């Protein structure tokens, strides 16, 4: 939902609804031993935690666009998501020599999130943008455990270029895109240290569909995840994706004079 409050100023809000189940299992196997009767004894411990979540989330945003001359413009934006504890039903099942099932009251939520960005546009053909976001996961309690996560930050840069808005050359209407990001994920090691950092580069094309306003997007992305602590794995990920954006006037009633 968005509202244009002034000529160049807009505000908006999003409402999201969460539902789903989370199951986490912890298992430990102890070394076997021989008792005084000569029997081999093996012990194990399995704890299963199940959570069913049903709740909502709110996002708020503001955007201001300042034209500069006839072909230039700068857009500033900011977003905010308030911290919110999610309604949930949680149980813990422990399996040793007997099975014990009990309900528990668990706290689990989403953090305060802040974001800001700036975009420069030239002649509706060149767009360059920078975004920064901060998610305060360090303030979130998970399964009644405080400080389970660390804050997540992300900075992204990107650009899109269209050679020509007019003309018959097909490749002149193709949208050429390039971007990159750097982020620090929110998960920790068992010692409470930040586990990894991540960065990626994306390149792609927006291919216009002939005699249509729809766009076919082809994208390739390289992602590098680096472990920051001893024993952590490094990951190299290569992704390819194809998508289509429909922008048709299906329900527009044509008029003939």
Report each predicted region and the residues it spans.
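Outer-membrane beta-barrel porins/channels
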Residues: 1-257
């Amino acid at each position: 939902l968005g509202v244009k409050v002034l000529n160049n100023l807009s505000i908006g809000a999003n409402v999201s609804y969460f539902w789903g189940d989370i199951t986490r299992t912890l298992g430990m196997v102890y070394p076997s031993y021989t008792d005084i009767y000569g029997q081999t004894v093996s012990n194990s411990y399995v704890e299963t935690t199940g959570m069913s979540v049903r709740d909502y989330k709110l996002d708020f945003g503001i955007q201001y666009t300042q034209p500069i001359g006839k072909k230039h413009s700068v857009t500033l934006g900011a977003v905010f998501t308030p911290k919110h504890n999610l309604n949930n039903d949680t149980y813990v099942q422990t399996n040793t020599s007997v099975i014990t099932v009990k309900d528990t009251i668990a706290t689990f939520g989403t953090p305060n999130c802040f974001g800001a960005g700036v975009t420069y546009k030239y002649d509706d053909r060149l767009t360059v943008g920078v975004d920064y976001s901060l998610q305060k996961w360090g303030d979130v309690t998970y399964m009644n455990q405080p400080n389970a996560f660390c804050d997540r930050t992300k900075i992204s840069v990107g650009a899109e270029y269209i050679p020509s808005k007019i003309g018959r050359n097909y490749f002149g209407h193709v949208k050429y895109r390039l971007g990159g990001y750097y982020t620090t994920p929110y998960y920790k090691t068992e010692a409470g240290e930040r586990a990894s950092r991540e960065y990626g580069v994306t390149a792609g094309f927006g291919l216009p569909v002939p005699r249509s306003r729809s766009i076919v997007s082809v994208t390739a992305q390289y992602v590098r995840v680096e472990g920051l602590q001893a024993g952590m794995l490094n990951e190299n990920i290569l992704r390819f994706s194809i998508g289509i954006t429909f922008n048709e006037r299906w329900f527009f009633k044509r008029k003939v004079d």
